[in-house]
Regions:
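Extended catalytic-interface subdomain
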Residues: 135, 342-343, 386-480
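Long, well-ordered hydrophobic secondary-structure segments characteristic of membrane-embedded
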Residues: 103-282, 287-294, 304, 310-345, ...
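Signature of short aromatic-glycine-proline-rich micro-motifs recurring in repeat-based ectodomains
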Residues: 153-167, 264-277, 481-492, 570-585, ...
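N-terminal export signals
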Residues: 47, 53-76
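Blade-edge beta-strand/turn elements of extracellular beta-propeller
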Residues: 116-132, 140-153, 224-266, 344-361, ...
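N-terminal secretory signal peptides
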Residues: 1-49
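Blade-level signature of beta-propeller repeat domains, shared across WD40, Kelch, NHL, RCC1
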Residues: 639-689
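Beta-propeller blade signature
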Residues: 212-219, 337-346, 393-394, 530-540, ...
Length: 689
């Protein structure tokens, strides 16, 4: 194999240079795309009046919108903000939500940090590999042979680098579920013997196209255990790749900004790329976030290309040599057709997946809906880039219950109409109490309030100087214009099914506090932030459609012995160390589960559980660790099973097919393969509690 030289030094968060290059195109080592001069949270805090002082004075607070002309009162008043975070999702004068005070916590013995080349689970738990990269799932697909790979074979096999996972019920087939998986990116160094990154072959590129995308696989559970395995050639099984057909829908579909020489309609797209996390909808579909799509394109020429991190020269992967659509000098709009949330109906293998333009275009990490009291979906989303933004979408349509054809057809339109918002956060502590070290302010919490700034509703833009189509296609620029708060890489965003609170994983930001970059603020309280934090957000009056919210930091990650860490006030002597929170999920008891990406503490990545309410709130426990070089992705927490995607095992600088850094999952002498793993309790009881 020819070395990838020159290698950039290891990622400041702990990830290898090999991972950085193939997953996100070395985004952390390039100039931050957000160079807008909108206010940083620190600037806002410097002028903010302490909310506690205002409340003590019984004054009325008005919060200006980005344009400075409108004010939010009523639900955005301090009383609503305080009530939103008081107790557990309570409303003024109303009881807490059922079961919120009866949290059970997590009662397993935590796994110690380690560097073992295996999946390590707690005592009393068992595991199995559900499916590996390359296993056949479609009729006619051959068994995997790393030395006989073809694009045709890969298009019928489980894809590479599994990320987001979802398990959906399958009526009428006992013990079976439908598993949907993202395949975020390929690492050809670990896929092909003798791979030359400067001169990939057409065959290698076409195999990589087929290894991207999504997989739908029916899985069967083994009687009396938690084991899962694929049902090969099931009629619902499906592969979607970088060359499959997708349809643009919503208010920007058909826009001139989405048209190319191959698609004069602006509605038909080939492929989905860099699908990271996602979500499962209440109406039985799955959502998939297109994240670091910029790395696949060459020769960016416009300011919009630059704002999305697209380079001005050849791409790392060299795909433009084999398909002109990846050369923006020839097809300047092709990149605009990526960076969306994809909706897939896993129960209809003949359906065309849809890219939902109403949810905006940016580096989507995930998209997890919740329903309002009247049945409208609200989707929370993070843009995974340093100093980028937090968003939500509120649908104007109500979900129809049931599984009739009419209900399903209607529900497949829910994410095409509504209002797209971006968040602006304000801290409530004096600016001199936020010093960049992570030291808590005098009130004992990093907290504050915020507003949701509307960007567009249908074909109406709320951003001066931008049309609605421009808002949807260039959503980052819209956020810049209205002064959204720049965050530390907002990734997965999930609402709790028990309390309604929303949890935002902010993975890290090594640039915070550097010369010419914004320093610490109350929502992002550490300079050179290696370990990240988790923000807890409560919509005013528990209303997901509210234009205001209260927030506080639930966790400030790192070594518990570090005074700059915080675990919701729980004694730090009793918690596990954690670094770089990425994906989050909930169990039925309201416990939050966190997977990590790029452990800067030196041990392997893992999955962690933590109670979000009750007496054990903040008690973080490590549930598992993954093998050498791997990332923990896509956690699914069922009552009696945990599912995780073990992504890029063995992805260590200098590793290759010939010189593997890991022997997982099949032992020495076998090629390293990203895989899905199931974990269960040996006694058959509920996970964790």
């Amino acid at each position: 194999v020819r070395n990838l030289l020159p290698f950039i030094s290891s990622h400041p968060g702990g990830r290898s240079a090999l991972t950085c290059r193939f997953r996100c195109g070395d985004a952390c080592f390039k100039e931050t795309p957000n160079t807008s001069d909108n206010e940083y949270a620190g600037d806002i805090i410097a002028r903010a009046v302490s909310r506690r002082s205002v409340m003590r004075a019984a004054a009325v607070v008005t919060v200006a919108t980005a344009a400075g002309t409108a004010a939010l009162t009523g639900p955005s008043a301090p009383q609503a903000e305080a009530a939103a975070l008081a107790g557990h999702g309570s409303k003024p004068g109303r009881p807490q939500k059922p079961g919120a005070s009866g949290a059970r916590g997590l009662r397993f013995s935590p796994v110690a940090p380690n560097k073992d080349d295996k999946v390590t689970v707690p005592d009393g738990y068992a595991q199995n590999v559900v499916i590996r990269w390359g296993e056949p799932i479609l009729r006619g697909a051959p068994a995997f042979d790393p030395d006989k790979q073809t694009a045709k074979a890969q298009a019928g096999q489980f894809g590479y680098n599994n990320d987001f996972l979802s398990l959906l019920p399958l009526r009428g087939e006992r013990g079976r579920q439908v598993m949907v998986a993202n395949h975020e990116y390929t690492d050809e160094i670990l896929m092909f013997r003798g791979y030359d990154p400067a001169n990939p072959t057409r065959e290698q590129v076409e195999i990589a196209w087929a290894a991207h995308g999504l997989s739908v696989v029916v899985v069967q559970e083994e009687h009396r255990t938690g084991k899962l395995g694929p049902v090969n050639r099931h009629p619902l099984n499906r592969r979607l790749t970088a060359t499959s057909e997708f349809r643009m829908t919503g208010p920007a579909a058909g826009s001139t900004l989405l048209r190319t020489s191959a698609d004069r309609t602006g509605r038909k797209v080939l492929g989905t790329l860099n699908n990271c996390a996602g979500g499962t909808t209440p109406w039985g579909t799955t959502l998939h976030g297109e994240e670091n799509f910029n790395q696949y394109f060459a020769n960016g020429t416009t300011a919009m290309h630059k704002r999305y991190g697209i380079g001005t020269s050849a791409s790392e992967r060299k795909w433009e040599r084999f398909d002109r659509r990846f050369d923006l000098a020839k097809e300047p709009n092709e990149a605009n057709r990526f960076g969306w949330v994809v909706e897939l109906d896993p129960y209809d293998p003949d359906s065309t997946p849809r890219k939902r333009t109403a949810l905006g275009r940016f580096k989507h990490e995930a998209a997890q809906p919740r329903l309002t009291s009247d049945g409208r979906p609200v989707v929370y989303m993070g843009d995974d880039e340093k100093f980028d933004y937090l968003y939500k979408f509120v649908s104007s349509k109500r979900m129809k219950k049931g599984n009739s054809r009419a209900a399903r057809e209607h529900n497949l339109t829910l994410l095409d109409e509504g209002t797209l918002y971006v968040a602006k956060l304000t801290g409530d502590s004096p600016v001199n109490e936020i010093d960049g070290t992570g030291k808590l302010p005098n009130d004992g919490e990093f907290d504050g309030s915020g507003v949701w700034i509307p960007l567009a509703t249908g074909t109406t833009s709320h951003v001066p100087g931008m049309t609605a189509e421009e808002v949807y296609v260039y959503t980052r620029l819209a956020g810049d214009k209205v002064g959204a708060t720049k965050m530390d890489r907002p990734e997965d965003v999930e609402p709790s099914p028990r309390t309604g609170r929303v949890y935002v994983a902010l993975t890290n930001n090594s640039d915070r506090g550097k010369e010419g970059k914004p320093g610490a603020d109350e929502a992002n309280p550490r300079n050179a932030n290696k370990h990240g934090q988790i923000l807890e957000l409560a919509e005013n009056w528990d209303d997901p459609t509210s234009d205001g919210f209260a927030w506080r930091l639930f966790l400030v990650a790192g070594d518990p012995d570090d005074p700059a860490t915080y675990f919701a006030g729980f004694p730090k002597s009793s918690v596990s160390p954690i670094s770089c929170p990425d994906n989050v999920a909930f169990d039925a008891h309201g416990n939050l589960w966190i997977s990590t990406d790029g452990n800067a503490l030196g041990s392997h990545d893992g999955l962690f559980g933590v109670a979000t309410h009750g007496d054990r709130r903040g008690e973080l426990k490590q549930f598992l660790t993954v093998p050498t070089g791997a990332e923990t992705c896509g956690p699914v927490i069922q009552d009696r099973r945990v599912l995780v995607a073990v992504q890029h095992p063995g992805e260590i600088d200098g590793a290759s097919v010939e010189k593997p850094a890991s022997a997982w999952p099949d032992g020495p002498g076998k090629i390293v393969r990203p895989s899905v793993v199931a974990v269960w309790r040996k006694d058959g009881r509920d996970i964790g509690v």
